[in-house]
Amino acid sequence: AATAFGSDPRVWGEVDRPCRTVAILGGSLGDFGELAIAAGADVVVTGEAGYHVAQDLALRGLPVILLGHDRSEEPFVDILMNSAVDAGVDPRHAIKILNPCQWWTVTKGENL
């Protein structure tokens, strides 16, 4: 996740466990962690989640990777831009603006 999104994610749960099924939810996890468990996910990757939600899921065996709300939505920017152009928006007016910074401080050795 760190390499793919160019950020230092926060990780809740076991970082070295095997992973076959990844649940991905852009933006905020909200209450969708239960759906990830029901779907058999080995990990959930999302933008943000409440402290107790992430803690609860990790304790129940579902690691949570938090990328940052903005970073988790970046993969969808091209899809939205292409849809706008397909709908008739002049490509010169479809401008992609990505956030070049990370909004939280990284503390090396942080154990959540």
Per-range role (PLM):
Residues 1-112:
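Hydrophobic structural segments
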